[in-house]
Amino acid sequence: MSSIRNTGSPENSYLDAALECILDVGVKRTTITDIARRAGVARMTIYRKWPDMLTLLGDLMVREWLAEAAELRPDEAAAPVDAESLAQNVVDVCRSMRNNAFFCKIVDVDPEFLIPYIFYRRGRTQDALLSMIRGFLQVGQESGTVRAGDPAVMARSILLTTLGFTLSMRTMTDEVKPAELDAELSLQLQRYLAP
């Protein structure tokens, strides 16, 4: 599982402890006290870094979900960015997110924590994903392998499209398999991006 990423820093060990607590009981039932106990530190140690559980949760979401995206990014030096590879990369990240234990726990137990990021504002993870997608679009446009267009608008369109496939896939798999829907998403994105 890619979710335990302790790089040796105290902050990461506290986030690891938070992740373990959330995977056990969900966000609403996890407290700073639980996290401190699991991390083997005093509550005030955690409070010095995060004033409340929501701030800590935000940092944990950014760390975990950007790690999913970073692991699946194509190697820009090894392969050109074209419509097909970019579409497949986006589908892979979407699938990886749907299968991420932390993401699944929030969707299953505490989905209300995602509502602000769906209806009201972008989060840091979404901003980072937009920047990443925009960068790939620019590389593909410069080489002529991705259609012309404003990369900022195109990145937002791609992210909006994939949000439905990430958040609502479970509601559409009663008669079809997730792999079939992923193939359709890939086709949509390839046609959207093709020069």
How does the language model describe each region?
Residues M1-S9, E142:
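N-terminal intrinsically disordered/low-complexity leader segments
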Residues S9-L19, I35, L60-E68, L72, ...:
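Generic hydrophobic, amphipathic alpha-helix propensity
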Residues S13, C21-T55, D59:
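Helix-turn-helix
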Residues L15, A87, V91, L130, ...:
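An amphipathic alpha-helix signature
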Residues D59, R73-F102, M154-I158, D182:
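Hydrophobic alpha-helical connector segments
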Residues A69-A70, P116-S143, A152-R156:
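Amphipathic alpha-helical packing segments from all-alpha helical-bundle domains
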Residues P74, V107-P116:
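Short linear capping/connector segments at secondary-structure termini
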Residues C104-V109, E142-Q188:
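Hydrophobic/aromatic-rich alpha-helical bundle segments in the mid-to-C-terminal region
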